[in-house]
Amino acid sequence: MERIQGRIVRGIAGFYYVATERGIIECRARGKFRKDNIIPLVGDIAEVQLVNEKEGYILEILPRKNQLVRPPVANVDQAIIVFAISKPEINRVLLDKMIVVAEINKIEPVVCINKVDMEKREEVENLINVYRKIGYKAVGTSAVTGEGMEELKSYLKDKISFFAGPSGVGKSSLINLIQSNIRLKTGELSEKLGRGRHTTRSVEFLPLDFGGYVLDTPGFTALEIDIPKEELRNYFREFIEFQENCRFNSCLHVNEPDCAVTEAVDEGIIDRQRYISYLTLLREVKEKEKRRYKN
């Protein structure tokens, strides 16, 4: 029987729907997965043995480049981290925390500042420039006027992406603007996949007309920074070129003497709010380490 490769775009009730060059194949996983305690995830690249044109068995899951727990997905390329410039007010610490979590998971963060149709235009441009200067992709968007949508689409093209951010920032509105028929497409795909047979909620990658997939549920519902405190500084990209000039190799850039990073902050080379985010997250990581050692 013929074997082909594809990406799992949906999994529910023991069925896995694999997007291949032949279309969507409904698959079961071989018993060895249960035996080895391996659960196929949405996003996995799978080797499938065809039973007929529409059905098959998953024989093998190829190595994952990353994996998230909530939502349970694998092999994501990028996180579109959405914050509104106002209503709700932007939380820079949370924004920077999401960037760190993305990079820990080997996911490229894309900063998206939404609701730019509101006032604060100068603030939006300054904020976008902060992140672009560091080396991140950053875009200002409006779900009302459509501003920035073409640039956002260019970042999504041929990538496996999910949207993350607080509630009320306009993630769903942006997804629906990216592709006007995405709800219809979801319905069509669900029909093909037989969603009517199952009532359990599942995660699903939705295909984009211009190439790529977007996850139908927000990512990063669990925001854990689970790294040693000494490693956090390496996830603030703008620190790296200065760190080697600190007096101490172990410098955490808090109140150590001759710290090149704090000097760069004082000179306005490193954005002060980014540095404040770092200090806040460092305290959080230290507290987590303390609790771990107590237990």
Curated annotation (Swiss-Prot):
Cofactor(s) in the UniProt record: Zn(2+)
UniProt GO molecular function: GTP binding; GTPase activity; metal ion binding; rRNA binding
GO BP term, example: ribosomal small subunit biogenesis
Main enzyme class: hydrolase
GO CC, alphabetical: cytoplasm
Location in the cell: Cytoplasm
Residue ranges annotated for the CP-type G domain, each copy included: 65-223
One protein family per Pfam: RsgA_N
UniProt binding sites for Zn(2+): 246, 251, 253, 259
Cofactor, free-text remark: Binds 1 zinc ion per subunit.
Ranges in a coiled coil: none
Keyword rRNA-binding: yes
Enzyme Commission (EC) number: 3.6.1.-
InterPro entries the UniProt entry points to: G_CP_dom, NA-bd_OB-fold, P-loop_NTPase, Ribosome_biogen_GTPase_RsgA, RsgA_GTPase_dom, RsgA_N
Binding-site list for GTP: 114-117, 165-173
Protein keywords: Cytoplasm, GTP-binding, Hydrolase, Metal-binding, Nucleotide-binding, Ribosome biogenesis, RNA-binding, rRNA-binding, Zinc
Similarity field: Belongs to the TRAFAC class YlqF/YawG GTPase family. RsgA subfamily.
Subunit structure: Monomer. Associates with 30S ribosomal subunit, binds 16S rRNA.
Biological role: One of several proteins that assist in the late maturation steps of the functional core of the 30S ribosomal subunit. Helps release RbfA from mature subunits. May play a role in the assembly of ribosomal proteins into the subunit. Circularly permuted GTPase that catalyzes slow GTP hydrolysis, GTPase activity is stimulated by the 30S ribosomal subunit.
Protein name per the record: Small ribosomal subunit biogenesis GTPase RsgA
Organism of provenance: Caldanaerobacter subterraneus subsp. tengcongensis (strain DSM 15242 / JCM 11007 / NBRC 100824 / MB4)
